[in-house]
C-alpha cells in the first residue's frame, strides 16, 4: 500500500520538529527565544508537539524592553501558566536605569540597548549555546540569506560570509566555548503558511492581531496605538478611534497598526491572499537606516 503523501503544512511541520529535536539532542544548553508574536506562538506549538507528552526540555526566554504592549505581557504569562514551560525574562538593567525609551532616544538606540544588548546579556548570563528564533526567510532580505543553523561568534555577531553549508538538511552545530548557533526552525515557512497553520492547529494568539476599535494617532503615515500613559504626542497630534489590527508586534511606540476588518483567522487568511505589502512595513525599527536589519544582526540582534 502506497504511503500517504504529506500536505505542504505537514511537510513544514515535520521539518521544523526535526530541527527542534536535533538541537535539543545536540546542544548542551539550548533556549527558545519567545517574542510573544505569531511566529513565536507557532514555534512554541511545534516544540510542545516535538516532545509530547513530555515537557519542553529547555527554557523560553523573553527579552523585555519595558515597552511591549500590555496585552503581549498578559498573554505571555497566561501561556506559561497554561502550558507549564520554564519562562525566563530579562531586561537590560543599565538601559532601565538610564531610562532608555523610543521617544527620547530614538528607535535605533532603544533597539540596540534594550533588545540587542539585552539579548546578549541574557545569553551570556545563562551560557546558552543555541537559541531558537522565529525568523523566516520571506520576511526580509537579510533573513533570506540566513542559514537554519546561523553561526555566531563569541560576541554573538553574525557574519554572512562565515556560515556553513547545509546540504540535504544536514546541519553543523560544532561550536567552541563562547560561540553559539541561532536556530531558525521556521526558515522555510511563509507568512501565509504561518496563518494557515495557526488556523489548522487552533493556536492561541495575542488579540492585537485581530481587527477591533482602537485609539491610534497618525504619525509619519503610520498608525500608532496608545497603550499606556507614557505615549507622547507631538504638537497637533490627537488620538482617533479606528478599526485596526497589527500584522506584526513589538514595542508599541515602534509598531504601526493597519486598517483592517479582519477580526477572525478566516478573514486574516483571506486578507493575506490579497495583500501586496510587506509584513514588516509596520516595524519602524526597520527604517532606521539603509540595510538596517542586516547591521542589527551583525551586532547580535536575532
Curated annotation (Swiss-Prot):
Q: Which Pfam families match?
A: PAPS_reduct
Name the pathway.
Sulfur metabolism; hydrogen sulfide biosynthesis; sulfite from sulfate: step 1/3
Supply the EC number(s).
Answer: 2.7.7.4
Gene3D superfamilies, sorted:
HUPs
Catalytic activities: sulfate + ATP + H(+) = adenosine 5'-phosphosulfate + diphosphate
Gene Ontology molecular function terms on file: ATP binding; sulfate adenylyltransferase (ATP) activity
Example GO biological process: sulfate assimilation
Q: Which domain of life is it from?
A: Bacteria
Q: Which InterPro entries match?
A: PAPS_reduct_dom (IPR002500), Rossmann-like_a/b/a_fold (IPR014729), SO4_adenylTrfase_ssu (IPR011784), Sulfate_adenylyltrnsfr_sub2 (IPR050128)
Alphabetically sorted, this entry's keywords are: ATP-binding, Nucleotide-binding, Nucleotidyltransferase, Transferase
Q: Where is this region: Disordered?
A: 280-302
Subunit arrangement? Heterodimer composed of CysD, the smaller subunit, and CysN.
Q: What does this protein do?
A: With CysN forms the ATP sulfurylase (ATPS) that catalyzes the adenylation of sulfate producing adenosine 5'-phosphosulfate (APS) and diphosphate, the first enzymatic step in sulfur assimilation pathway. APS synthesis involves the formation of a high-energy phosphoric-sulfuric acid anhydride bond driven by GTP hydrolysis by CysN coupled to ATP hydrolysis by CysD.
Stated family: Belongs to the PAPS reductase family. CysD subfamily.
What name does this protein carry? Sulfate adenylyltransferase subunit 2
Q: What is the lineage of its organism?
A: Bacteria, Pseudomonadati, Pseudomonadota, Gammaproteobacteria, Alteromonadales
Amino acid at each position: 500500500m502506497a504511503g500517504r503523501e504529506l500536505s505542504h503544512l505537514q511537510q513544514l511541520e515535520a521539518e521544523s520538529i526535526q530541527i527542534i529535536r536535533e538541537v535539543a539532542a545536540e546542544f548542551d544548553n539550548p533556549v527558545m527565544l519567545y517574542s510573544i508574536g505569531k511566529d513565536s506562538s507557532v514555534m512554541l506549538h511545534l516544540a510542545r508537539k516535538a516532545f509530547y507528552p513530555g515537557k519542553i526540555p529547555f527554557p523560553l526566554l523573553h527579552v523585555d524592553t519595558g515597552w511591549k504592549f500590555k496585552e503581549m505581557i498578559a498573554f505571555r504569562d497566561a501561556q506559561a501558566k497554561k502550558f507549564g514551560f520554564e519562562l525566563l525574562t530579562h531586561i537590560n538593567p543599565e538601559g532601565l536605569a538610564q531610562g532608555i525609551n523610543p521617544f527620547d532616544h530614538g528607535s535605533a538606540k532603544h533597539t540596540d540597548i534594550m533588545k540587542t544588548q539585552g539579548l546578549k546579556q541574557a545569553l551570556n548570563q545563562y551560557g546558552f549555546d543555541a537559541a531558537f528564533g522565529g525568523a523566516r526567510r520571506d520576511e526580509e532580505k537579510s533573513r533570506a540569506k540566513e542559514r537554519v543553523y546561523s553561526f555566531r561568534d563569541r560576541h554573538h555577531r553574525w557574519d554572512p560570509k562565515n556560515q556553513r553549508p547545509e546540504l540535504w538538511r544536514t546541519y553543523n552545530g560544532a561550536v567552541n566555548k563562547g560561540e553559539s548557533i541561532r536556530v531558525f526552525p521556521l526558515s522555510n515557512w511563509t507568512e501565509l503558511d504561518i496563518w494557515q497553520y495557526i488556523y489548522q492547529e487552533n493556536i492561541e494568539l495575542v488579540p492585537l492581531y485581530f481587527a477591533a476599535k482602537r485609539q491610534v494617532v497618525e504619525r509619519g503615515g503610520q498608525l500608532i496605538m496608545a497603550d499606556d500613559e507614557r505615549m507622547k504626542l507631538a504638537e497637533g497630534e490627537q488620538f482617533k478611534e479606528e478599526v485596526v489590527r497589527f500584522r506584526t508586534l513589538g514595542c508599541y511606540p515602534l509598531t504601526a497598526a493597519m486598517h483592517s476588518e479582519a477580526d477572525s483567522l478566516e478573514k486574516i487568511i483571506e486578507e493575506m491572499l490579497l495583500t501586496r505589502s510587506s509584513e514588516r512595513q509596520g516595524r519602524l525599527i526597520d527604517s532606521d537606516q539603509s540595510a538596517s536589519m542586516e547591521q542589527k544582526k551583525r551586532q547580535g540582534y536575532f
